[in-house]
Amino acid sequence: MTREHEPPGAVGTPEILISVDVETSGPSPGTGSLLAIGACLVEDPTQSFYRELQPIPGAAWDPAAARVHRLDRTELERHGLAPAVAMTDLCGWVDMVRGDAQAVFVGFNAPFDWMFVADYCWRFLGRNPFGHAALDLKALYMGRDGVGSWAATGKDAVAARYPVDEAHTHQALDDARMQAALARRLLHDPR
């Protein structure tokens, strides 16, 4: 069994938390494309990664999503990286920063971002450097603070309780850094 197919390590195995954010052209990998990916170490957001990708030919382009991320389809088709190249770069960066530690994917509504990253890693490379290790900040907030409903875990609600200096801009690296700051607050602030 190769390292990327192994389950997360046992208790005591070193872990490295990596904040990841994506911008997409649709709601799922089967109906849209991964357009941009930003990542940084939670404990050192200056160690970061960012790539823009070419859309999958024929994949949907949701105008509502485009208004949010403000990426231009024609520019991405011309200047974005081929998905296999971008995912090779991402996996290489994750492998470099994690060393012998288990890489843990951290996101705000991690299931959305993780499904695109996992799909693209498997589809274009045949491996996912995160395995199934993901930490969702919304769920962490809900459990840590005893929040009684998922609806009360939106970015505005969490930011009101745990303000951070970084802004949510819908640029993947900016948002990964904002999530890293929020993760540090959720993990290290006293209760």
Question: Where are the predicted features?
Answer:
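A short alpha->loop->secondary-structure connector
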Residues: 121-131
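Short, motif-level signal for alpha-helix interfacial/capping segments enriched in acidic residues
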Residues: 1-7, 150-155
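Short, well-ordered secondary-structure micro-motifs
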Residues: 30, 117-118, 145
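Short aromatic/basic micro-patch
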Residues: 134
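Conserved non-catalytic scaffold segment of RNase H-like nuclease domains
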Residues: 2-114, 160-162
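Short, glycine/charged-enriched secondary-structure capping and boundary segments
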Residues: 32-35, 119-123
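Acidic, Mg2+-coordinating catalytic module of metal-dependent nucleases/exonucleases
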Residues: 104-111, 115-116, 120-121, 154-191
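Active-site-proximal helix-loop-helix substrate-binding element of RNase H-like nuclease domains
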Residues: 54-69, 73-76, 137-180
